UniProtKB/Swiss-Prot annotation:
Stated role: Binds the lower part of the 30S subunit head. Binds mRNA in the 70S ribosome, positioning it for translation.
HAMAP family named in the record: Ribosomal_uS3_B
Alphabetical UniProt keywords: Ribonucleoprotein, Ribosomal protein, RNA-binding, rRNA-binding
Organism expressing this protein natively: Geobacillus thermodenitrificans (strain NG80-2)
Description of how the protein assembles with itself and partners: Part of the 30S ribosomal subunit. Forms a tight complex with proteins S10 and S14.
Keyword Ribosomal protein attributed: yes
Disulfide bonds: none
NCBIfam families linked to this entry: rpsC_bact
SMART domains: KH
GO BP, one annotated term: translation
Name this protein carries in UniProt: Small ribosomal subunit protein uS3
Recorded GO MF terms: mRNA binding; rRNA binding; structural constituent of ribosome
Length: 218
């Protein structure tokens, strides 16, 4: 059932790593909610900075936050002012010492989250859903994707009956665990209601980390 399951969840521990890396016993639920608040705050504050994902690591009374973004200049601000203000706000939110790392996404057209959000924004601006999907597919293939599949669901073009339409190019092997598949969803708020956007991008094969370690030892 590789077609149904979230491709990232299926590959965690094989070729993908967790986005929250910490261990807790009694206060697990509190820390989990804290993670959600941190992510929610960052995504709201940096909604125009093309943030793809936020990784959180914890050690004692310290929180390390890694922000993956296509526009690092926007996150850092003039002379680092914006990132310092963000660090202080997160320290106040968590009550812990916060350290922020910023990682630039070199090819935003190969990042499923950014592609999905781009399609959603276009749908909100009344661009044809077919055109928005086809343009995203062309850009991803030009950027070096091995395959891409996009899907939009809802009242497309203001139709009375909701439906789903998908377009794809290349291959997207969802069953192959060593296939590096990025997957993301986004929502477009249109005058007719919400339209859901899903994007799968196949970026090539990756050897599982265990195999890499074994080969290194030989």
């Amino acid at each position: 059932m590789g077609q149904k399951v979230n491709p990232i969840g299926l590959r965690i521990g094989i070729i993908r790593d967790w986005e929250s890396r910490w261990y807790a016993e009694k206060d697990y639920a509190d820390l989990l909610h804290e993670d959600l608040k941190v992510r929610e705050y960052i995504n709201k504050r940096l909604q125009d900075a093309a943030v793809s994902r936020v990784e959180i690591e914890r050690a004692a009374n310290r929180v390390n936050v890694t922000i993956h973004t296509a526009k690092p200049g926007m996150v850092i601000g003039k002379g680092g002012s914006e990132v310092e203000a963000l660090r202080k706000a997160l320290a106040q939110l968590t009550g812990k010492r916060v350290h922020i790392n910023i990682v630039e996404i070199k090819k935003p057209d190969l990042d499923a989250k950014l592609v999905a959000e781009n399609i959603a924004r276009q749908l909100e601006n009344r661009v044809s859903f077919r055109r928005a999907q086809k343009q995203a597919i062309q850009r991803a293939m030009r950027a070096g994707a091995k395959g891409i599949k996009t899907m939009v669901s809802g009242r497309l073009g203001g139709a009375d009956i909701a439906r789903s339409e998908h377009y794809s190019e290349g291959t997207v092997p969802l069953h192959t665990l060593r296939a590096d598949i990025d997957y993301a969803t986004a929502e477009a708020d249109t005058t007719y209601g919400k339209i859901g956007v899903k994007v799968w991008i196949y970026r090539g094969e990756v050897l599982p980390t265990k195999k890499k370690a074994e080969e290194g030892g030989k």
